[in-house]
Amino acid sequence: RIDADNLVSRHVSIFGMSGSGKTVMVRRIMDELLKKKYPMLVLDIHGDYLGFIQKQKKLYPKNEVKLFYPNLSVSSEDKEIIYTLIDKLGNSLTDPQKDFLSSLLEKVKYEGGSLLKYIELLVRRAREFAKDPTKFSKSVRPASMYVVVRSLGQVVKKLKNMEQTNFRHRQKMSKLKFEELPDAATEPEKIINKGQLSILYLKGYENLPASAIVSILLENLFKHRQEVEEEIPPFLTIIEEAHNFIPSRSEDKDNLPSVETIRKVITEGRKFGTGVMIISQRPSRLDETIASQCNSQIVFRMVNQKDQRATTRDSETLSVDDSKQLPNLANGQGIISGQVVNFSLPVQIKFDADLINDDIGNENFITAVENWDDKESVKQRKKFAKDFSNITSIDRRRANW
């Protein structure tokens, strides 16, 4: 029997190779927590948890299951994250050009809203300054300003491409109701509420933008839990493919904004009722500080020796002898250790067909190729382009500067 309170308050890690059973285990835990009406936020990259909203009426009639797509809402307070995004996604800039970008972010204030709209505003203001540099600074050459304008344009293009990719994947699941992610700074209760499961569908977003979205989201939710008023109840954040958000320093991705945010949440979270569950097939690639804060581990089949060593390094109760058994485990077999149990226990998880999204399922690639139709594929791409164009034109008409 797993101690539910220790699971949601003292953090847990779930590791295993692809197909070993870790995601099935996560869904089973979520199923039990939903019955207790415990609030959860899931960062879902591949759509592994969309079955919850599809089966909600049948399995969870007393719960709210919300399915969100990303909306990177920012304000001038997020200028460090914005600068990192522009610097990494845009063209390579010289030091004077980077100085101009930093000064531009300081000068162009933004009360809050879409990152894309803010960058488009930066483009307009940068062009104005380039036409009349005296409005900005005599020390910055117009040529440098135009280089920054082009770099900002590249960022806009990349972000729009990611939006389109995410939209294309959502179109394949037209039966599901997707909502734009509310602003966690002003409407946290729409994301975290008693009995509510919130799933953020991140498919199509590259590591850095996804990291920025997660960082701003969790930072704002954590602030609300720190406040005396407690606008939102305690909740559990489930981070799928965690190595994308909290990579180790050896991965040379320590500049991802989500690393510092999750590090803060996982080290201080217990005091404020914000638990974290991290899931990964590569524990050796995770930030050691964050992984070591997980007081319980559930480990499935694992053959990579680096990953085996990482599981024993981060666990106080998983022994070296236990880790030697990991390569021999069958799919669905694992070991539970830490504060959720009195002593290390073997576990056998059965496949949860009732929680699989029918539109995704376990795809058979041979069947997919046999049923492939080039004409239908072209038709679908044209339909997508038209639908996305209609949505973006509506957004442009709504824009209010």
Regions found by a protein language model. Give the residues of each.
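Loop/turn-to-beta-strand initiation segments
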Residues: 36-41, 194-197, 232-236, 272-277
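Conserved helicase/translocase P-loop NTPase motor core
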Residues: 167, 171-235, 249-254, 261
